[in-house]
Amino acid sequence: MKKIVGVLVLIAIGLYLSLSVEAEKVEEEAVRVSDNPVFEEIYLAGGCFWGVEGYFQRIPGVYQTEVGYANGLTDKTDYQHIKDTGHAEVLYLKYDKNTVTLPEILAHYYRIIDPFSYHKQGNDVGSQYRTGIYYTDEATGEVAKAFLEEKQKAAKEKIQIELQPLKNFVVAEDYHQDYLKKNPFGYCHIDLDLAYVPLDREVIGH
């Protein structure tokens, strides 16, 4: 019996190490940028930010990610109080537009959320889990607006994604950053393997 337990422990350790190595490999591959990168940024709310970050960290051209809380009623908040302060869980993305375009970023975002769900994504319910696109420059806002308008034309239901200028952003606690890299078996409401599936017709304006 002890031998069996020992073998199972070794298998579990091996699997964990394998997943950790794979996570590092994914990060190295996904961070690829062009020889002459042009960086832009956007903030995306898509439910629990662990999965949203884990997904976009697999996309080549995504240079930096950081999870936090955005567009609330106050300039300060934390994980324990976002329900009261009205913030959404969001992912900050810094990307090289010469490697991945904004329409492609938006198409990736749209495929991993339920755009018709109000204040609910996966098993998570509440205003902090709403969907939203927040921008810091008008050009990004216009592209996002056109993208959502095209999606709405093809939809039978009302799209619940809010589109707003970024009002405020509070960086989340350290244990939330790179959560799925630190916890390979952690909760995730998103199919991360979708990151490797070509966008094809999902892209608008590219």
Spans of features found by a protein language model:
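Flexible coil/turn and secondary-structure edge motifs
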Residues: K2-H206
